Amino acid sequence: NEMVELEARRGKLALEQGKYMLQDAQTRIVEAQPAVVVKTLQRHGDLVETLLEQESHARLVMGRQGEQHQDQAQAIGSHLENVIRTVKQPILVVMTEFEAPKRFMIAYDGSITAKKALNQVLTSPLLKGLECHLVMVSDAQSQATAELALVTESLMAANFNVVTAVCQGEVQTALEIYQLEHHIDLMVMGAYGHSRIREFFVGSNTTKMISKSHIPLLLLLR
């Protein structure tokens, strides 16, 4: 059967292409970080299903653009959006070029899920040594300042150098302005509660933020 033979050849070519891609990625990592031990895994099947199988011990780094969107600066690869909606482990979304960040920003709203995301920051070694900007978008200046003061104590106890700010206005605009003015290299976002931040970060707003961001985003999705 010609169709069966054609599919078999396509499958073999895809397998070989995947093998070469993994080898190339491994070589680039080893050349940049000789001390890093790199292990590769090639699987056949759906990407999201495979990542879910590895989810309990995986931390994901994914590029924003897929292969079909490399010439579109703000396009999001279809795989990335599907993974974000399904996988619950942290995902680092990177742009075309990546530099090690010196400072990161947490958009905080005081909800239970925001506190869970903050706890991941406190307990993870990944962000240690980076300057932390804790930012809240709220029209209630005094209340927000008091709430940030409590959170700042926890961050400082975990040896973070913390800068706090309360911004006013529309969430996306306020965060973008702060990011530019303070040279933020990394945005940290969680799956926030029923608030203005949640309205901004879930559903189509997540897609909007990722597509418009000029810096990497660390998504804390649990």
Please place each PLM-identified region on the residue numbering.
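Short, flexible, mixed-charge acidic loops at enzyme active sites
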Residues: 1
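A short alpha->beta transition loop at the rim of the catalytic pocket in nucleotide-sugar-dependent
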Residues: 88, 213-214
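Glycine-rich, Arg-bearing micro-motifs that act as flexible, cationic patches
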Residues: 63-82, 101, 190-212
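Structural beta-alpha unit
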Residues: 10-61, 157-187, 191-200, 207, ...
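Short acidic/Ser/Thr-enriched loop-to-helix initiation segments
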Residues: 73-89, 94-160
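Short, flexible loop segments at boundaries between secondary-structure elements
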Residues: 214-222
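Short, ordered loop/turn segments at secondary-structure junctions
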Residues: 66-67, 96-97, 137-139, 192, ...
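Hydrophobic alpha-helical segments and helix pairs
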Residues: 36-93
